Amino acid sequence: MKKLLICLAAVALFSATTLADDFDYDAFVKAYYHAQVMTQQPNATQEDLEHYLSFLTDDIGNQHFPNAPDDSREPDGKAMMRKGMSRYLGVHTEYKAEIIDYQYGYNAVSIKHKFSAKGKRSDGSDFSYSKVALDVLELEDGKVAVMRRYSK
């Protein structure tokens, strides 16, 4: 019986390690970032938003320093992001973004990127901004479970 348990534990450990080693972080970063950027384009659609959200767990935790310091995972985290991001679809008249660098390790990715935008607020006034940010993503089963954005 002990030998059977040891064999099962070894198979489970080997399978988890093999699955983790097979994850294509490079492809994930490129696809995730492209999907994120598409949600900010002047012609962004609900389909673009849904494609981006497909990279996230349903209970995503989302934190933007310094304004939103809570990274708690919420059962309706993805639904909350959908609601929040839907308000901003198509508000940009111009949006540019570029990855500066990225790194990854077991179930984690950091993406340093720069982005700039111009657009119109709902009151008709113009806005523009340019930022460099570091996004740290914690992955679970190949999806983003917690994201933290560090920027000024």
What name fits each language-model region?
Residues 1-4:
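Positively charged n-region of N-terminal signal peptides that target proteins for export
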